[in-house]
UniProtKB/Swiss-Prot annotation:
Protein name: Protein translocase subunit SecA 1
One GO process term, biological-process aspect: protein targeting
Gene name of this polypeptide: secA1
Taxonomic lineage: Bacteria, Pseudomonadati, Pseudomonadota, Alphaproteobacteria, Magnetococcales
Reaction(s) this enzyme catalyzes, per UniProt: ATP + H2O + cellular proteinSide 1 = ADP + phosphate + cellular proteinSide 2
Superkingdom to which the source organism belongs: Bacteria
Organism: Magnetococcus marinus (strain ATCC BAA-1437 / JCM 17883 / MC-1)
């Protein structure tokens, strides 16, 4: 109550922050007349003047008013668009590393130019991250004219371009690209063998467009680069035939809230029996150690049948299972679910199974974007997730006021008892709008539901366009013309974000498409006049009919997705309306207490085809959505705690790789490792507290032969006077040193340096790949520790640290072993072998952005609180060798993760 009174007196935090920016906006406006008087060349010269001032010690904040004024003036001249005051505020928010929430149609693309220009002046690069290639290319071409006019270079990163083009794009002052491409380039760079091959510069500043989609919706989906494994595909078909013989509830239970499926006790017995009959089980039970691989196959097959539906989660196209993006409804060709789930779906649909893949490198979007020195975001819908952005990413959400007041009419939800009643009402609503010339956009949650709406419209003979994963080729065109009179567009999960729906249609697109390029100039002019006249008439008709009408056919789990759909109407003060039609058979209503509501509606005497409309219903639905959002937030928070463990290890390995590539001569490093390995072998076989007569001389001799290719007569040492543990160490080291020097003399120092570096990198990559597989296995079963009253997160941290310590030890041992045994005649052989390795790896690599696995079981077992999360702004300090290791082991850095360094 007191907080509400305080807000009335002093305004909200958002209001106070916006007021604090007004003096900056006034300073920018005050420069407008001065910059209008400049010639084009004088305006361009301002960029070079700003760069010179930065070099002399001024900061970007010092330059902000002048830089923004220059961009505004440049935009007026090149694009014919002037930044409004609210857009200047949006630009300041982005520069300060916050999230700018701007409603649809308020010009986010133009807003980004302000802070991108300012931050690019440092020469360290500025990235604009979008959700698809179309938007990246469109915005880079469109806004690129402005940057180039002001003397800055622009690059674009899209799928399928070569490394040379990528490097040039990253070296540009401003780079546009998709979240996936930025992530995969980061991973690929950390698999390269030389610094020259790497395409990215250090990550400096990024603006993430549709930041809610990338940092919230896709937070549980890691980017994975994988290669093929040797696993047989026959097992998937054989196991798949058994699953239809199981009964739901009796043999397995499906928890839709937790998105998990588990066998009952009877189900475990039944599947074991079926597998024995099919000859798939070796001796013993399904859960015996030697059958553990089959558990993986059975679990994925059950998940494929019970949790995944064709035309909702995936479609079968050209004999392949193609994932459908849950949030956009788009197809994701080339993307595959990991851990054998995609193979299980292929077996279920009886298409050719592609080999299961093994992870070579992976990263989540949270950890990718935390690598930037400064991060900002923009979206039309972030406020509902403001708490999550603040607590996980330390990103504050600032709501930017609209340039014109919103006049859209949002109706209360209408709730029907059955799906059929609801769809009939939707079709009737569309018919009313269609007859008065009003354009309608219908939002559905799946391909199946969009086909059902289409079926009802066909009965009423209403022409319409369908936009979903099956009809994605014309996406931009369909969305752009969805504002024409009588246009009816059915869209799954509002594909087409980023493309404005303009009332009357998109004039530019019509001119480009309908004017005949082969006609005479006079005819083309006549055609243009006719199209412009039609456009003005269409726009007037749509405005008179009430603007764009939005119909939601179901509430999404997230209020934000619903708000995105609503936000397509009422852009820039245009009229518009929206309403949601619900039924008790909808997923959200069914999962969250529809039985109780069904009984209540029957008591109220609700007849077939009647709907209940009341603000209380809206509140009940919103309450259900908040529950889901809260649960999903907890899952994402828990996932991030688990992923942070992996992230620390990844940073250590990637930093180590880069250090190896930066140094031409790693001889001292190799000598240090050799000494460590020799000392460890002596300590293990010729103990300090053991008499020489009791030494394991035979074991030590074999170990030295295996590790260094050296045959030492250790037996004779035992009988020599005065030979101690320390003397044995010195002798072994002297022998190793002499052998290494002899090899170097034979091969020559340049080749030896090349070999040391090359072998070190190859061993590190091979063992890191194995380590990722071990970490995947650890992750899969860790949540079960909760049933033994152990904290899964602490157990994961402890065992992950043990695995990582073993990895570092193995890297040292195997690198030294290879160096001792490898034989090379010519330097060209090494270079040829490396090139062959890189080529083979590139051909076999596949890029995946799957549904993430269950880090810690997605809430199963007790949850655990970890250390607070780091904000997205880094101080960039390097860990000192004598400081505590950041992985939390309690050891010094040089004795733990820094051991390789």
């Amino acid at each position: 109550m007191f907080s509400a009174i305080a807000r009335k007196l002093f305004g909200s935090r958002n209001d106070r922050y916006l007021r604090s920016l007004q003096p900056l906006v006034d300073r920018i406006n005050g420069l407008e007349a001065e910059y209008e008087a400049l010639s084009d060349s004088e305006l361009t010269a301002m960029t070079y003047a700003f760069k010179a001032r930065l070099e002399k010690g001024e900061t970007l904040d010092d330059l902000l008013p002048e830089a923004f004024a220059v961009v505004r003036e440049g935009s007026k001249r090149v694009l014919g668009m002037r930044h409004y005051d609210v857009q200047l505020i949006g630009g300041i928010v982005l520069h300060q590393g916050k999230i700018s929430e701007m409603k649809t149609g308020e010009g986010k693309t133009l807003v980004a130019t302000l802070s991108l220009y300012l931050n690019a002046l440092s020469g360290k690069g500025a990235h604009l991250v979008t959700v698809n290639d179309y938007l990246a290319r469109r915005d880079a071409e469109w806004m690129g004219k402005l940057y180039q006019f002001l003397g800055l270079s622009v690059g674009v990163i899209i799928h399928g371009i070569e490394d040379q083009q990528r490097k040039a794009a990253y070296n540009a002052d401003i780079t546009y690209g998709t979240n996936n491409e930025f992530g995969f380039d980061y991973l690929r760079d950390n698999m390269k063998f030389s610094l020259e091959e790497m395409v990215q510069r250090p990550l400096n500043y990024a603006i993430v467009d549709e930041v809610d989609s990338i940092l919230v919706d896709e937070a549980r989906t890691p980017l994975i680069i994988s290669g093929p494994t040797e696993d047989s595909t026959d097992k998937y078909y054989k196991v798949d035939r058994l699953i239809p013989q199981l009964e739901k509830e009796r043999h397995y239970t499906l928890d839709e809230k937790q998105r998990s499926v588990t066998f009952t006790e009877e189900g475990n017995e039944q599947i074991e029996q079926l597998m024995r009959q099919a000859g798939l089980l070796r001796d013993g039970d399904l859960y015996d150690l030697h059958n553990i691989e089959m558990v993986h196959h059975v679990n994925q097959a059950l998940k494929a049948h019970a949790m995944f539906e064709v035309d909702r989660d995936y479609i079968v196209k050209d004999g392949q299972v193609v994932i459908i993006d849950e949030f956009t409804g788009r197809m994701m060709p080339g993307r595959r679910y990991s851990d054998g789930l995609h193979q299980a779906l292929e077996a279920k649909e009886q298409v050719v199974i592609q080999n299961e893949s093994q992870t070579l490198a992976s990263i989540t979007f949270q950890n990718l974007f935390r690598l930037y020195n400064k991060l900002a975001g923009m979206t039309g819908t972030a406020d509902t997730e403001a708490a999550e952005f603040q607590s996980i990413y330390n990103l504050e959400v600032v709501i930017i006021p609209t340039n014109r007041d919103m006049v859209r009419i949002d109706r209360d939800d209408m709730v029907f008892r059955t799906l059929e009643e609801k769809l009939k009402a939707v079709a009737e609503d569309i018919k009313v709008s269609y007859e008065k010339g009003q354009p309608v956009l219908v939002g559905t949650v799946s391909i199946e539901k969009s086909e059902m709406v289409s079926h009802f419209l066909k009965k009423l003979k209403i022409p319409h366009e369908i936009l979903n994963a099956k009809h994605h080729e014309r996406e931009a065109e369909i969305v752009a013309q969805a504002g024409r009179p009588r246009a009816v567009t059915i869209a799954t999960n509002m594909a087409g974000r980023g493309t404005d729906i303009q009332l009357g249609g998109n004039l530019e697109m019509r001119l480009k498409k309908e004017i005949d390029p082969e006609a005479s100039p006079a005819e083309r002019t006549q055609q243009e006049i006719q199209i412009r006249t039609e456009y003005e008439q269409d726009k007037a008709l749509v405005l008179a009919s009430g603007g764009l009408h939005i119909i939601g056919t179901e509430r999404h789990e997230s209020r934000r997705i619903d708000n995105q759909l609503r936000g397509r109407a009422g852009r820039q003060g245009d009229p518009g309306s929206s309403g949601f039609y619900l039924s008790l058979q909808d997923d959200l209503m069914r999962i969250f207490g529809s039985e109780r509501m069904d009984g209540m509606l029957k008591k109220l005497g609700l007849q077939d085809g009647e709907a209940i409309v009341h603000p209380w219903i809206n509140k009940a639905v919103e309450s259900a959505q908040k529950k889901v959002e809260g649960r999903n937030f907890d899952i994402r928070k828990n996932l991030l705690k688990f992923d942070d463990v992996m992230n620390e290890q990844r940073k250590v390995i990637y930093d180590q790789r880069k250090e190896l590539m930066e140094n031409e001569d790693i001889r001292d490093f190799i000598d240090e490792i050799r000494e460590e390995v020799v000392h460890a072998l002596v300590d293990s076989h010729l103990g300090e507290d053991v008499y020489p007569e009791e030494w394991d001389a035979k074991g030590f001799r074999e170990a030295m032969l295996n590790q260094f290719n050296l045959d030492l007569n250790v037996e004779s040492w035992k009988h020599e006077e005065g030979v101690t543990h320390l003397v044995a160490k010195e002798r072994a080291m002297a022998a190793v040193k002499a052998y290494s020097e002899a090899r170097e003399a034979r091969l020559g120092p340049p080749l030896m340096r090349y070999l040391e570096k090359s072998i070190m990198l190859q061993v590190l990559d091979t063992l890191w790949k194995e380590h990722l597989l071990n970490m995947d296995h650890l992750k899969e079963g860790i949540h079960l520790r909760g049933y033994a009253q152990k904290d899964p997160l602490n157990e994961y941290k402890r065992e992950a640290f043990q695995l990582f310590s073993m990895l570092l030890q193995r890297i040292r041992e195997e690198a030294i072993e290879f160096l001792g045994k490898v034989e090379v005649q010519q330097p060209e052989e090494v270079a040829a072998y490396e090139a062959e390795l890189a080529e083979a790896r590139n051909q076999q690599m596949s890029l995946n952005h799957p549904e993430s696995g269950s880090w810690g079981g997605e809430g199963e077992g007790p949850s655990s609180e970890g250390a607070p999360h780091l904000p997205f702004k880094r101080d960039g300090e390097k860990v000192g060798r004598n400081q505590a290791c950041p992985c939390g082991s309690g050891k010094k850095y040089k004795q733990c993760c820094g051991k390789l360094s």
